[in-house]
Amino acid sequence: MTFVDDDEEEDFSVPQSASNYYFEDDDKEPVSFARLPIQWSVEEKVDGSGLGFYLRGRSDNGLLPLHKLVKAWRYDLSNFQPEISVLTKDNIWIKLEEPRKSYGELIRTVLVTLHSIQFLRRNPQASEKALWEKLTRSLRSYDVKPSQNDLVDHIGLIAEAAKRDRNLANSKFILAFLTKKPTKRRLPDEDNAKDDFIVGDEDTYVASDEDELDDEDDDFFESVCAICDNGGEILCCEGSCLRSFHATKKDGEDSLCDSLGFNKMQVEAIQKYFCPNCEHKIHQCFICKNLGSSDNSSGAAEVFQCVSATCGYFYHPHCVTRRLRLGNKEESEALERQIIAGEYTCPLHKCSVCENGEVKTDSNLQFAVCRRCPKSYHRKCLPREISFEDIEDEDILTRAWDGLLHNRVLIYCQEHEIDEELLTPVRDHVKFPFTEEQKVFVKEQRRILESHVGRDKARLKVKDPALQDTCGKASKNSFRSSFPSSKDGFSTKKHGLVSSVPDHSRKRKDIDPSIKHKMVPQKSQKMMEDSREAGKNKLGVKEARDAGKSKISLGERLFSYTQEPNPVKPGRVIPVDSKHNKTDSIASKEPGSEIPTLDNDSQRRLLAVMKKATEEITMGTILKKFKIQSTMSTHSTRNVVDKTITMGKVEGSVQAIRTALKKLEEGGNIEDAKAVCEPEVLSQILKWKDKLKVYLAPFLHGARYTSFGRHFTNPEKLQQIVDRLHWYADDGDMIVDFCCGSNDFSCLMNAKLEETGKKCLYKNYDLFPAKNNFNFERKDWMTVSKDELEPGSKLIMGLNPPFGVNASLANKFITKALEFRPKILILIVPPETERLDKKKSSYVLIWEDKTFLSGNSFYLPGSVNEEDKQLEDWNLVPPPLSLWSRSDFAAKHKKIAEKHCHLSRDVGSSKLKIVEEEANASLHPLGASDGMCDDIPMEKDELEVAECVNKILVSEKIDTVETVARVHQSDHLSRRSQLKKEGKTKDYSGRKLGKSMDSNNVDWKSNDMEEDQGELSRAPESIKVKIPEMTSDWQSPVRSSPDDIYAVCTSISTTTPQRSHEAVEASLPAITRTKSNLGKNIREHGCKVQGTGKPEVSRDRPSSVRTSREDIYTVRPSPENTGQKPFEAFEPSYGASLSHFDDGLAAKYGGFGGGYRMPDPPFLPDQFPLRNGPNEMFDFRGYSDLDRGIGQREYPQQYGGHLDPMLAPPPPPNLMDNAFPLQQRYAPHFDQMNYQRMSSFPPQPPLQPSGHNLLNPHDFPLPPPPPSDFEMSPRGFAPGPNPNYPYMSRSGGWIND
């Protein structure tokens, strides 16, 4: 036998590895292990005196929990994957395996760095591209691709590792990386959650999945550069030409594109880009390549655009007729008129071979379009000479490329010679409306503006601010006129983003379009002439100074100059623009207008103005001015307009749809209509309509809550949410409402928590002023930092964020909330919101109620109807209410949910199911020593049980008219009047607001019958019954008799027949089937019965201490019990659905000891089996209820109405009615202490020839009803007690003896 010493036993107990791990600090906040000191070698010991972190996880293959304090870490690169270990305070190394999923994101950058070091150590000559490809494969489990930004976070670790490892120090990438010392940069595919909300971010916008889908839908518009016909980083023109261009030389360097010649800063300064052709409305004819005016507003247009929505080419009418070679002059003139009218589809939309249209869904019938002339082919009709690859034997060069155009082939037809260097035809096909002389002038102006010396000289030469302003404008405008210009708004850059700072608008004048292209050079020439003229005006300086002093001081003039929006007086105007650009106003120089020499006071005041302007006008203030609020983000042009919608596309698509519709109305064929307007255009225009509708809502309807899709939760629903949520709050917690609206939630929560003795903190955020300012802060939720709130272990966040399109805003608000790691998130969000358990966050769904907010649960703030009443919002698809708990709090919160019946399986379930569960839970509530029934006082408030029963009746779609019998006639109140006395405002448990409720009381919810029917038709509410604990409080000095268990409280009937006999009892008190009601209301001598939330009802009690049988059943007739309509039979399905109540009751009272037991079933023929199917219900004697119903004789309401079907006992079936006399029939099944079970309806009284009341002259009480199944006899008779029963008369009350 092998013995193990103590040291080896200790080794077995030491954890060797940790899985599902994470690290936390003393505040139980997750931290990265990289913050610990690193131990590079065995010789180098780490000082463990510093504060360490706690390692949490599982060890021993996940079987044992792990909780260790660690002080250092190390890594090992010798294996296939980097291995990380941490050193405990006991100097034991623990290897780290797989981290917890939510913790993996926190240490992702460390893992990327270690994988990089390992790869570069083994491959010193590896390139940067090879590194990222390797890391992408190794770390593909993470959503974010590895990048240089991950290494920047640990540049110190990389530098130290390179010092200690020779192979790593020889890595080319490491040398370049450490030499360059890079900083974090924005990556094209990097996601930034704040971009959708904060316009001021310097980072570029990253499209969401939905935006990428929109880009795919938008690809049928041109997506290649108009100069080089290649893709890449392109800038789209906002005008009608629908073209795109490479903006910088770098963007077009792969295809040797001349590009637009901008630099990166200039591109970022562009808001909306219009090419020079669209800016001046001077376009090229796609056939002859000559420029011509396209401005048809003055009737002088020369070129006209093709009407197709996706075609941006212009044509001279005579060029089209000449190309088509129409021999008939009349046909040519008709075609020209059609072209001028804007109803012409160019030859590009017909195959040059078969002259048929395009079918994009069929690859063979897709078009191959030439980029130099209006010629197209179907793929199947493409000539052999237009090849996708070089054929050297036949001297055929590549003329076709697939994949550059959406569902099309890009070709150069044989009419265009291919340049061997460019591999495309000569690129002289794009002409802008400016001359070569202007290009030279613009280059000179650019050189001067970019030179510091040039700028200083310009400032010395131009002293007049008016002249300086006009010269600046002229230079700027001449620069923009020579290059593709920009306008206010946003650029449509296909794969990039520009700054959001708007450009200043410039006023222009429209001119004759026929001479626009001749006037551009004149502007620069006349500007220079004005500058020279300004230099000659120095002779009048003294006169101007004297005149200025005599009229107004220089400081006032300067102040008025800075305040005036247009300080330059209009003089001569050089018109150089069109619809998009308006003309500059250049003031001619007036004598004496030059600024005189400044005195000391003026200089001081001027410097003060400059200093103030420098302090106040900063980039931060400008960005803040144009900042878009969070709830407006889905309506901003950054998210909607700039990427997919341009003015040219919208106008062209609308015009195409109108033309196509006109063609169809005039009898044209569908093919011609499709050539004008493709099916994809119709789909796209509908998407644009939806997007623009959302975007324009704040402008069309004002900046109101509803314009941003906001709606508020009704206070009644908020109160019910508070009643659920307050159980989870602890002292010192902080309740955060990140979109508080009217700020009702925190107020209600505060009142509830104060009532329960808890003190919490509150933070409420919104962009709009709240109705009340209880801890309210008008602030964007996206700007809230962790320093402003408590630690996550004390945070409870919610509740109703703005939804946004496809829950986009809800997802953003939740993502922001997860940064604080609150212990609880309670949310009202649409169903399409991304679930927290699908995110990489450690949150567990505690419960979810999908029907709680159905119906009119919301209202529209500030909106009223014609009666000045608040408009309510009815949800077609109600948003679920859900409560999420952080994983380390989940067990605690689940226990709270179970205790208060909040779990998902309970929330939103039907009343019937809840009552059944409560009944099953209360079958045997007492121990063996407490088995006697007379120790259990059992009385229930009548109205309360009537509430529960009535709700169940409503859920079964049975129209009921209930009558609540009281001991006194004055106590017969209808349910509606009773509720009016109590007040209508109740919390979720049915209690009146502002009143406390005893913990042992039963939760119930009271509504009017119509409200019940409406609520239950939408979603059944839960009837929650609390089970009281068995304490000494259950015993009372005034004891109820054991017979009180037969008390019945309510008489419910759909109809009550008019009988000639009065009932002995007006209504029998009924017991509930749940144990929770036991001992709640104890009947005492000369006292009142307390009901849950109900007014006290006085009862006449006899003087005896022990409750007798007489005082239970002695009732007085009431007017409400008489003169009502005949009763209609219950449906069998109703009794079947409720039979389980009696099963629970029978088990309950059949198991309390020898004093009570259920009767033995009688012998029945074989045709009466005990139970032969789930839908056929039997009582304990085996009688089927399939025959139940009302026979020829009707049951009078004077007997208290038909008893509650749940509470009434069943009779024997018709088969036994005439077989034996009444008493003999039941004799074999009784003993002295047992009663036979009664019918579901009260017993039929003996008929009397006259009178309206069935009198009981001896005032004997009626026999008590034993517990029963829910069956009845067609005749309604029920057996009486054993005649030998000591408390009753010999007849058992059936006759007056």
Curated annotation (Swiss-Prot):
Motif placement: Nuclear localization signal 1: 445-452
Subcellular location: Nucleus
Maturation and modification: Phosphorylated by WNK8.
Region (Disordered) residue spans: 471-547, 562-598, 969-1017, 1085-1109, 1260-1297
One GO term (biological process): leaf pavement cell development
Zinc fingers (PHD-type) by residue: 222-281, 282-352, 351-417
GO molecular function, one term: histone reader activity
Stretches with biased composition (Low complexity): 475-487
UniProt GO cellular component terms: heterochromatin; nucleus; protein-containing complex
Annotated motif Nuclear localization signal 3, positions: 610-617
SMART domains with a match to the protein in the record: PHD
Residue ranges the record marks as coiled coil: none
Phenotype upon loss of function: Impeded use of distal polyadenylation sites at intronic heterochromatin (HC)-containing genes (e.g. histone demethylase gene IBM1) resulting in a lack of functional full-length transcripts. Abolished expression of At4g16870, a transposable element (TE) of Copia-like retrotransposon origin, associated with methylated status. Strong reduction in RPP7 levels due to altered H3K9me2 levels in COPIA-R7. Disturbed expression pattern of NLR (nucleotide-binding, leucine-rich repeat) defense genes due to abnormal H3K9me2 hallmarks; some being repressed, including RPP7 and RPP4, but many being induced.
InterPro entries: Cytosine_MeTrfase1_RFD, NSD_PHD, PHDvar_NSD, Znf_PHD, Znf_RING/FYVE/PHD
Renumbered ranges of motif Nuclear localization signal 4: 979-986
Chief location: nucleus
Residues annotated for Zn(2+) 3 binding in this entry: C306, C311, C346, H349
Compositionally biased spans, kind Basic and acidic residues: 526-547, 969-990, 1096-1109
Record remark: domains: The PHD domains recognize both active and repressive histone methylation marks at the intronic repeat elements in genes.
Quaternary context: Interacts with WNK8 in nucleus; this interaction is involved in developmental processes regulation but not in RPP7-dependent disease resistance. Interacts with EML1 and EML2 in nucleus. Component of the ASI1-AIPP1-EDM2 (AAE) RNA regulatory complex composed of at least AIPP1/EDM3, ASI1 and EDM2 and may contain CPL2, AIPP2 and AIPP3/BDT1. Binds directly to AIPP1/EDM3. Co-associates with AIPP1/EDM3 to histone H3 lysine 9 dimethylation (H3K9me2)-marked chromatin and transcripts at a critical proximal polyadenylation site of RPP7 to hamper proximal transcript polyadeylation/termination.
Protein's name in the database: Protein ENHANCED DOWNY MILDEW 2
Species of origin: Arabidopsis thaliana (Mouse-ear cress)
